[in-house]
Amino acid sequence: MASARTLVLLLIGAVLMCQVSADSELLNEILAAHMEEDMPEKRCIDRYRSNICGSVIRPLDCTRRKSRMGRFARTNCKKLCGFC
């Protein structure tokens, strides 16, 4: 029963896609409305804030260029390092 429901939904979706692609004005209107929506910028967060960023990694580690800890800090603790 679930597969029949899925098949019906896919067929309805295909018919709607054919209708939209046949009417270029409608397609352009839909695309323009989608492009106008403001996408929120990705928030700057520290991935390992609860256990690593701030306790193991210090802001001084962000400036170390050749250490593994510095590379980890620059990649995963951007808020702590002030890169945001």
Curated annotation (Swiss-Prot):
Single GO cellular component term: nematocyst
Major location category of this protein: secreted
Keywords: Cleavage on pair of basic residues, Disulfide bond, Nematocyst, Secreted, Signal, Toxin
Disulfide partners: C44-C84, C53-C77, C62-C81
Gene Ontology MF terms in the entry: toxin activity
Keyword Cell membrane tagged: no
Residue stretch(es) of the prosequence: 23-41
Family listed: Belongs to the sea anemone 8 toxin family.
Name this protein carries in UniProt: U-actitoxin-Avd8e
